[in-house]
């Protein structure tokens, strides 16, 4: 298993096209960045996109469990500008056997500039009924807690 530093701490350079007329990041970009960071974290951990996300090219089998977003939050502490090199810290947490969330901290030179949170619920793809998280996500969540104290 790779070091969690490799898959829970990511980098992102803010592109000009992600900013508004004032040169600062438009609010909705943060949610896109959060989801992209989650996808990259899964890939770096060793989970193929096709194992989690339907519609992937060359997919052999459609995932039987979907992970829709059921809640999201975003807070900007400081303006984020085009050209900023951000560090993204992910903190996944299992909430129950069928639900988890990921907290995201966006830092510029060790200063928090934004935070995000996305919560996912596991549902059976066909019936849309709640179910347990798929095994790859369970393993990713478990590995993310190694060396970190969990609340009782």
Swiss-Prot record:
Keywords: Hydrolase. SUPFAM superfamilies: Thioesterase/thiol ester dehydrase-isomerase. The keyword Signal does not apply. InterPro entries: DHNA_CoA_hydrolase (IPR022829), HotDog_dom_sf (IPR029069). Gene3D superfamilies: Hotdog Thioesterase (3.10.129.10). Disulfide bonds: none annotated. Its EC number is 3.1.2.28. The active site is at 20. One of its GO terms (biological process) is phylloquinone biosynthetic process. The keyword Hydrolase applies. It catalyses: 1,4-dihydroxy-2-naphthoyl-CoA + H2O = 1,4-dihydroxy-2-naphthoate + CoA + H(+). One of its GO terms (molecular function) is 1,4-dihydroxy-2-naphthoyl-CoA thioesterase activity. It comes from the Bacteria. Pathway: Cofactor biosynthesis; phylloquinone biosynthesis; Quinol/quinone metabolism; 1,4-dihydroxy-2-naphthoate biosynthesis; 1,4-dihydroxy-2-naphthoate from chorismate: step 7/7. Belongs to the 4-hydroxybenzoyl-CoA thioesterase family. DHNA-CoA hydrolase subfamily. Catalyzes the hydrolysis of 1,4-dihydroxy-2-naphthoyl-CoA (DHNA-CoA) to 1,4-dihydroxy-2-naphthoate (DHNA), a reaction involved in phylloquinone (vitamin K1) biosynthesis. This is 1,4-dihydroxy-2-naphthoyl-CoA hydrolase. It comes from Synechococcus sp. (strain CC9311).
